């Protein structure tokens, strides 16, 4: 079931030029990324039911913020790990009570759900992470790289799903979207060069204005 962390965060930086409200779903994640800032509170911990917000409670709190924020950003964990029906139902209700923009943050492993939400115009933008040059790596030969950065044992399909999601976001062509990479200290500069080159080629292909950000690595606070 879709549940939410009760601490909403006001942010000026996640969506440049907009005052946004960041809301984390407490629904787990299918990655265990190096230096994840949400791991201790939202992923590694077992959810405590009485501390979580239901979709109804989240919508009630969000409705009181309408007009105060330009956008709401839904993150996780991995927000799209919930069922397509549950996501659609929830975001339809968000549209009814919140007049600002709706952004979803994702690791890209659920392109089908992402495509569905974009086609229904239930979200205005997507912030997607391209953590590795998935178009170049081999899940078997580069298993140690995957383990070190995303903490998961991938398959070819896993990599293809992420690339499909990145393609969707760039083709959707919203200035509210972002493709992002963290400059992980474990990786050589060549990794980041290859990712940036891949994104630029897609942007040229679709004449897309979606920005790409190579962000510095900030270790989680202890």
For the regions a language model picked out, list residue spans one by one:
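Short, conserved beta-strand segments within well-ordered enzyme catalytic domains
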Residues: 22-24, 71-75, 103
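N-terminal [4Fe-4S]-dependent radical SAM core
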Residues: 1-25, 29-47, 65-66
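Glycine/proline-rich, flexible active-site/cofactor-binding loop segments
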Residues: 54, 67-76, 80-90
